[in-house]
């Protein structure tokens, strides 16, 4: 889409500006992701004690948790870099997860884990497309509107 840049003040006046709408649903799914990641940490500690701190799969779980934080922190703050940073962190986490399968202890490597990873890859596609194409995300974080938006022809652009 050909986006038209608007000023931050114009963006704030736009009806789609703000942390609202489908952005809440996307946020909720990411919070669920954090909960499932923490559940993974609990599973590793329960099954292997605290020794897994030296196990790559344990570190990967914590890294995955850290990679989800930029979106969760930056989205409500309306940080301009949120879409780019969040997409990059998300796909780095997926790549690490996919690359870590060989390091996971046998009991943790099961169909449940594979199903979760498949879900999160599919969600990653939705997450990425939403952050790239959403009108709300573009207005709020990137201060730009679509070509048919009334603000695209504002006096500030002339």
What is each residue range found by the language model?
Residues 1-158:
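Topology signature of small-to-medium multi-pass alpha-helical membrane proteins
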């Amino acid at each position: 889409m050909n986006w038209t840049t608007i000023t931050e003040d114009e963006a704030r006046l736009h009806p789609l500006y703000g942390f609202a709408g489908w952005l809440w649903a996307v946020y909720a799914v990411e919070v669920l992701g954090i909960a499932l990641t923490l559940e993974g940490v609990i599973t590793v500690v329960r099954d292997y004690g605290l020794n897994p701190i030296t196990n790559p799969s344990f570190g990967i779980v914590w890294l995955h948790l850290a990679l989800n934080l930029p979106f969760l922190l930056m989205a409500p703050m309306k940080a301009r870099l949120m879409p780019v940073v969040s997409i990059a962190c998300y796909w780095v986490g997926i790549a690490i997860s996919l690359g870590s399968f060989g390091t996971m202890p046998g009991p943790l490597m099961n169909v449940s884990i594979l199903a979760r990873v498949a879900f999160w890859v599919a969600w990653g596609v939705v997450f990425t497309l939403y952050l790239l194409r959403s009108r709300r995300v573009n207005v709020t974080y990137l201060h730009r509107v679509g070509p048919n938006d009334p603000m695209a022809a504002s006096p500030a652009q002339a």
